[in-house]
A protein has these predicted regions:
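Conserved class I S-adenosyl-L-methionine
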Residues: 1-38, 51-55, 73-76, 80, 134-164, ...
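Class I SAM-dependent methyltransferase SAM/SAH-binding core
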Residues: 41-43, 49-95
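A short glycine-rich, Lys/Arg-flanked "PGG" loop and its adjoining helix->strand segment in the class I
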Residues: 119-131
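Short alpha-helix
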Residues: 163-178
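A conserved beta-strand element that flanks and buttresses the S-adenosyl-L-methionine
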Residues: 107
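Conserved Class I S-adenosyl-L-methionine
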Residues: 49, 183-248
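Short catalytic micro-motifs in class I SAM-dependent methyltransferases
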Residues: 110-111
Length: 248
């Protein structure tokens, strides 16, 4: 998806911010895979607005290079940067603008389905990583679609997700073909909103690229259904499953 052809960057953080608790959860998950390995330089590939970049710098006391093809996303990331250990560069997964053997961790969040050429992107990750270092991937996969909290309210999103998202096995095949081994894979469940009413407000921000692809009629119908559910007592927290891959 070409984010620069949309206005998603302007509301991305509003729709995607799940709070410090979820950010801490993901830093703990990443740390559990890196363990005692010394991490001095991190590539945040597909960094978007930099949601994870400064948290990575703080957790590992490391330099973080955020790379993203979207000018609008990078403008937002640079505008909110507070940590001098973090910098942002334009680039794509298929041609990472970094030297060989230059990073100790590649962090990727929900980017796999955006790669034009996933096999080339995986080879690029292998190229820039130092020997034995971790490529950590958060990803949506087809196997989780039925568990995504908005699918029941936006049924037209299901075929879009089925077309865009890879199968779990395909993600592994792509990285293993690039010379990685799959050290671990798991599913982590994160809270995305404290209630369905709060979840509706997040989705209304228009930050989800799948929902942004729906017709206005289908999107509005889904929002009505979600808000009706919230009004009828959908006060429970909303959760979402995310696939995690540790490639080395």
């Amino acid at each position: 998806m070409d984010y620069d052809a949309t206005d998603i960057a302007a509301t991305y953080d509003l729709g995607r911010d799940h709070g410090p608790g979820v950010l801490d959860l993901w830093m703990d998950v990443v740390s559990s895979h890196v363990k005692e390995r010394r991490v001095k330089t991190i590539l945040d590939l597909g960094c978007g607005t930099g949601r994870f970049s400064e948290a990575l710098a703080a957790r590992f006391d490391a330099e973080v290079i955020g790379v993203d093809p979207s000018k609008k996303m990078l403008e937002r990331a640079r505008g909110k940067r507070r940590d001098r250990r973090v910098r942002y560069e334009p680039g794509r997964g298929e041609s990472i603008p970094l030297p060989d053997d230059s990073v100790d961790l590649v962090f990727m969040s929900m980017i796999f389905h955006h790669f034009d050429d996933p096999k080339l992107a995986a080879r690029e990750c292998r190229r820039v990583l130092r020997g034995g270092a971790v490529a950590f991937l958060r990803a949506g996969t087809r196997e989780r679609i039925s568990s995504y909290p908005y699918v029941d309210f936006f049924p037209e999103s299901r075929p879009v997700l089925e077309e865009r998202l890879p199968a779990h096995a395909f993600v592994r095949e792509v990285f293993e073909a690039a010379g990685f081994r799959t050290a671990a894979s798991d599913v982590v469940t994160q809270e995305v909103a404290p209630s369905h009413a709060a979840y509706a407000e997040k989705l209304a921000a228009g930050a989800d690229s799948v929902l942004a692809s729906l017709s206005r009629r289908d999107f509005d119908a889904g929002m009505r259904a979600l808000r009706e559910h919230a009004a009828l007592g959908g006060g429970e927290a909303v959760f979402e499953p995310i696939d995690v891959f540790d490639f080395r």
